């Protein structure tokens, strides 16, 4: 009995240690779960008016930030940022999907309302019992069989104790009289004790085999769910990703998959078996010892369960607060580390650390509440069980005194109850963790329910296109990111197959929006877009995006080798094809000069490469994709003139015999375009060739051209003035040197 009590105490201590370890591990993951930056394209065109409104709110942001530090409350940073113009605009976006739920963005007090336990478990069990995997179903059935065997062996163990004690004390009328013990030990007791050992070994064997058999089912289910969520996130539209923080999504998926692993084991091998074992024990006590024993046992178990459920539901709110603080801390860490250079530029290391520490402080507060209430829960559980055990032992003692029960019955009752204490202690832990895991899983399965606004029509046909038919046409296209703020208003134009067309205009005129609409990142509110004479909404997304290549303004590369990033344009390409496109983009020789050649790591987002090298990689992988249509979204706007001219040369070679659209800010890069389309206030204001547009001195294009030319000329004049000043100083220095030399001519002695 003492040994069983010690084991029970160790189990409770282990449960407490497990939860504390889990809490501390969450903080560590905030720093190490750094993932890709995801999509970074701007979600809307703010224009000059947006910039003006932004500058007007700078002072209010500064005041809000100062108050936040005075109150030492990290949450006020988010409140202060809401005064920025971008925040209300984002909240009004037509592509806004709302919050994911399950603690990702939820209010801690409302988080539990989003958890539909029945639907979550039903969705999870569809992965455990898949219709297309009879092998996994067989494993589940075998595991349940081993589970039943293990529980049966557990119930047999106390009976072995009972029979052993009764055999050793078979002299009726003399309680604990062991005068003939040597004879009984040699016969019945020895056999019973051997049976006791076999029963315990059998129970352990069944449990371990069950775990081994079910392991493949659990891991396969987790892998399939994680893969489906990952693929689903990639299938969601750009608007969803622009309204989500990558760090929060990553943590939600991580916690959700870990929650699935726990719930699978708890539900199949803990909760249901515990209920089965409690029912079996109560029935045994009823038939062997009487109704009083069964009633006390059921009362104890009922009080224990009710107390555990009530307190755990109360404690769950602290877990939701911990999740939210964990998300905020993770986002702060990821954003700060991804913007390492920006932090250094402004010497804001301490600011970032204090901001991060504010979120950790919130997490710490919620974690302390969770830990303290856990201690209260454990004490209450122990008190309830101790009262029930005491009552059962008193009843058993009275039965022995009355002659209705034997000493073996006392040992059996004690063993059955202590055997229940292990699953009961585990029941508390299982319920707490299951409840919390369901909250984590809710976010995961909620993500699976988010429907993308951009998807194929039913029975969408693949795009039929060749380089000879790759005509692009916009027909009266209207589009707005934010309701009531037009970005494109009735835009119509056509790009003939094999021609180069440039689209220019001021900031916020809708140039880059055309690229996103053609690639179907968004859908126009009105009008149609045609590629090769086919409405892009009627063809499959996969075939459409395979036919269009994009060289973005900011080429974000994977944290991998140069070869991997080049191969990404066509993962089935041969090494020779990769080398060929690198040569065409003028990148091959530069790669060979690197220490590791094509195996050189490019760093996070490709930051180890120069801007020109990143753009060449983007061009090369677009070539490797070999699409009939290529889009250049201001691909050289951030480069110097020499690098820009070199890359433009590579572009000219690429676009030969292809349909190409150049989104340009520098007009000098598109003077050779077959047609130039000028956008102004979301409309096609002008169109024509470079020289044709310049012929009209009052045209928008002509004004833009002369403005840029004047800026370049002034820059050149400043350079020439600096050069002349340098030359005049050099001439003055030479003249002075000649005077010094002439002054020492004479006898040849410097002292003359």
UniProtKB/Swiss-Prot annotation:
Any one GO cellular component localisation term in the record: mitochondrion
A GO BP annotation: iron-sulfur cluster assembly
GO molecular function: ABC-type iron-sulfur cluster transporter activity; ATP binding; ATP hydrolysis activity; ATPase-coupled transmembrane transporter activity; identical protein binding; protein homodimerization activity
Modified residues (Phosphothreonine): 342
Residues bearing the modification Phosphotyrosine: 340
Annotated glutathione binding sites: 315-319, 378-381, 428
InterPro entries (alphabetical): AAA+_ATPase, ABC1_TM_dom, ABC1_TM_sf, ABC_transporter-like_ATP-bd, ABC_transporter-like_CS, P-loop_NTPase, Type_1_exporter
Major localisation: mitochondrion
Transmembrane segments: 141-161, 186-206, 260-280, 291-311, 383-403, 410-430
All copies of domain ABC transmembrane type-1, residue ranges: 140-436
SUPFAM superfamilies given in the database record: ABC transporter transmembrane region, P-loop containing nucleoside triphosphate hydrolases
Transit peptide extent on chain: 1-22
Catalytic reactions on record: (glutathione)4[2Fe(III)-2S] cluster(in) + ATP + H2O = (glutathione)4[2Fe(III)-2S] cluster(out) + ADP + phosphate + H(+)
Domain ABC transporter: 472-706
N6-acetyllysine sites (modified residues): 216, 251, 350
Pfam families named in the record: ABC_membrane (PF00664), ABC_tran (PF00005)
Modified residues (Phosphoserine): 336
Location(s), subcellular: Mitochondrion inner membrane
Mitochondrial intermembrane-side positions: 162-185, 281-290, 404-409
Membrane topology (UniProt): Multi-pass membrane protein
Keywords: Acetylation, ATP-binding, Membrane, Mitochondrion, Mitochondrion inner membrane, Nucleotide-binding, Phosphoprotein, Transit peptide, Transmembrane, Transmembrane helix, Transport
Residues in compartment: Mitochondrial matrix: 23-140, 207-259, 312-382, 431-752
Function description: Exports glutathione-coordinated iron-sulfur clusters such as [2Fe-2S]-(GS)4 cluster from the mitochondria to the cytosol in an ATP-dependent manner allowing the assembly of the cytosolic iron-sulfur (Fe/S) cluster-containing proteins and participates in iron homeostasis. Moreover, through a functional complex formed of ABCB7, FECH and ABCB10, also plays a role in the cellular iron homeostasis, mitochondrial function and heme biosynthesis. In cardiomyocytes, regulates cellular iron homeostasis and cellular reactive oxygen species (ROS) levels through its interaction with COX4I1.
UniProt record similarity statement: Belongs to the ABC transporter superfamily. ABCB family. Heavy Metal importer (TC 3.A.1.210) subfamily.
Self-association state and partner proteins as the record states: Homodimer or heterodimer. Interacts with C10orf88/PAAT. Forms a complex with ABCB10 and FECH, where a dimeric FECH bridges ABCB7 and ABCB10 homodimers; this complex may be required for cellular iron homeostasis, mitochondrial function and heme biosynthesis. Interacts with FECH. Interacts with ATP5F1A. Interacts with COX4I1; this interaction allows the regulation of cellular iron homeostasis and cellular reactive oxygen species (ROS) levels in cardiomyocytes.
Record protein name field: Iron-sulfur clusters transporter ABCB7, mitochondrial
Taxonomic source organism: Rattus norvegicus (Rat)
Gene that encodes it: Abcb7
């Amino acid at each position: 009995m003492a040994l069983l009590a010690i084991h029970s105490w160790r189990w409770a201590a282990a449960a407490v240690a497990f939860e504390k370890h889990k809490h501390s591990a969450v903080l560590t993951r905030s720093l190490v779960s750094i993932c890709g930056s995801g999509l970074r394209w701007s979600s809307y065109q703010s224009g000059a008016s947006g910039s003006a409104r932004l500058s007007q709110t700078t002072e209010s942001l500064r005041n809000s930030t100062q108050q936040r530090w005075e109150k030492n409350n990290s949450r006020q940073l988010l409140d202060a940022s809401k005064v920025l113009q971008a925040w209300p605009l984002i909240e009004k976006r037509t592509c806004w999907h709302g919050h994911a739920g399950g603690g990702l963005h939820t209010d801690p007090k409302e988080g539990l309302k989003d958890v539909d336990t029945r639907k979550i478990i039903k969705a999870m069990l569809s992965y455990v019992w898949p219709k297309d995997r009879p092998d996994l179903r067989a494993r589940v059935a075998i595991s349940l069989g081993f589970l039943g065997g293990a529980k049966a062996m557990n119930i047999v163990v106390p009976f072995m104790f009972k029979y052993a004690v009764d055999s050793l004390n078979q002299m009726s009328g003399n309680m604990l009289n062991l005068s003939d013990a040597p004879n009984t030990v040699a016969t019945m007791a020895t056999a019973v004790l051997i049976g006791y050992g076999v029963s315990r070994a059998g129970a352990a064997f069944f449990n371990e085999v069950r775990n081994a058999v079910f392991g493949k089912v659990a891991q396969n289910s987790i892998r399939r769910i994680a893969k489906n969520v990952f693929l689903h996130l990639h299938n969601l539209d750009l608007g969803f990703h622009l309204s989500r923080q990558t760090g929060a999504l990553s943590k939600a998926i991580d916690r959700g998959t870990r929650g699935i692993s726990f719930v699978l084991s708890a539900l199949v091998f803990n909760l249901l078996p515990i209920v089965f074992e409690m029912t079996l024990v109560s029935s045994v006590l009823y038939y062997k010892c009487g109704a009083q024993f069964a009633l006390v046992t059921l009362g104890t178990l009922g009080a224990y369960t009710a107390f555990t459920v009530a307190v755990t539901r109360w404690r769950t709110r602290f877990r939701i607060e911990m999740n939210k603080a964990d998300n905020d801390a993770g986002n702060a860490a990821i954003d700060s580390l991804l913007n390492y250079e920006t932090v250094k530029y402004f010497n804001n290391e301490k600011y970032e650390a204090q901001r991060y520490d504010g979120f950790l402080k919130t997490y710490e507060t919620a974690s302390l509440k969770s830990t303290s209430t856990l201690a209260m829960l454990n004490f209450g559980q122990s008190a309830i069980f101790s009262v029930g055990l005491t009552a059962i032992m008193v009843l058993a003692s009275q039965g022995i005194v009355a002659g209705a029960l034997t000493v073996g019955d006392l040992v059996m009752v004690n063993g059955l109850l202590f055997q229940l204490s292990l699953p009961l202690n585990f029941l508390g832990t299982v319920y707490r963790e299951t409840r919390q895991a369901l909250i984590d899983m809710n976010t995961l399965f909620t993500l699976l329910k988010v429907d993308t606004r951009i998807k194929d029509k039913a029975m969408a046909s693949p795009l039929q296109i060749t380089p000879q038919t790759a005509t692009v046409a916009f027909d009266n296209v209207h589009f707005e990111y934010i309701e009531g703020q037009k970005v494109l208003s009735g835009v119509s134009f056509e790009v003939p197959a094999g021609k180069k067309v440039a689209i220019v205009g001021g900031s916020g005129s809708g140039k880059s929006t055309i690229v996103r609409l053609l690639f179907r990142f968004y859908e126009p509110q009105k009008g149609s877009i045609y590629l090769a004479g086919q409405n892009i909404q009627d063809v499959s997304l996969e075939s459409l995006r395979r036919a269009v290549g994009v060289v973005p303004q900011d080429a974000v590369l994977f944290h991998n080798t140069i070869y991997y990033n080049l191969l990404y344009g066509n993962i089935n390409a041969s090494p020779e094809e990769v080398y060929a496109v690198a040569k065409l983009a003028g990148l091959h020789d530069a790669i060979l000069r690197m220490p590791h050649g094509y195996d050189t790591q490019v760093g996070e987002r490709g930051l180890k490469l120069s801007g020109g090298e990143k753009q060449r990689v983007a061009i090369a992988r677009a070539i490797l994709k070999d699409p009939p249509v290529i889009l250049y979204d201001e691909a050289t706007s951030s480069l110097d003139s020499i690098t820009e001219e070199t890359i433009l040369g590579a572009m000219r070679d690429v676009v030969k015999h292809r349909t190409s659209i150049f989104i340009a800010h520098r007009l000098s890069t598109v003077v050779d375009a077959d047609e130039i389309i000028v956008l102004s206030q979301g409309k096609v204001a002008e169109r024509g060739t470079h020289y044709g547009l310049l012929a009209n001195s009052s045209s928008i294009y002509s004004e833009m051209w002369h403005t840029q030319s004047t800026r370049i000329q002034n820059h050149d004049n400043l350079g020439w003035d600096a050069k002349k000043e340098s030359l005049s100083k050099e001439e003055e220095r030479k003249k002075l040197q000649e005077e010094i030399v002439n002054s020492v001519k004479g006898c040849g002695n410097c002292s003359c």
